């Protein structure tokens, strides 16, 4: 009787130890959740989620941000879907990114509340480092072009004062796209 119990316990211990062994093949982390630290430094809440597919050669990204400037009487909610290409795969190394952002802008112009939608076609070049414990850092640089206007019913277009005293519109020009994404990969 004792031999049967010992044999059962021993076989359970051996099989549980066998199934607990790690596979030599590591599964690739596919989901990334994070933020871009440059907008955060400027006080803008910003977050993104990315999903790797095709053995990490491609990534679908979706970003969102919120902006509010009481001095300028303007606020915005933005979404930026993008697609990344990693030439070497595995979701690491050099990447090329293309996307189109949409900004839903509200401007309080006197007694009028102006609402507008702007679009921002963007291209970026970057590099992603990722570690086995999940941390991911991806600096990037590129450019975007703003399409659309934030215009009141009397024809006044929302502008921002620059440091040199000049004024510029929100859209209608080529702008730099710079960032440092920090995320965790699952």
For each feature predicted by the language model, list its residue ranges.
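Cleavable N-terminal export/targeting peptides
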Residues: 1-28
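Outer-membrane beta-barrel "beta-signal"
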Residues: 172-186
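Transmembrane beta-barrel architecture of outer-membrane proteins
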Residues: 30-32, 43-45, 76-80, 118-122, ...
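Outer-membrane beta-barrel and related beta-rich outer-membrane complex signature
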Residues: 110, 151-153
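Gram-negative (and chloroplast) outer-membrane scaffold detector with strong preference
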Residues: 50-139, 184
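Extracytoplasmic loops and strand-loop junctions of Gram-negative outer membrane beta-barrel proteins
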Residues: 30-32, 107-109, 160-167
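Structural signature of outer-membrane beta-barrel domains
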Residues: 40-42, 67-69, 101-105, 144-150
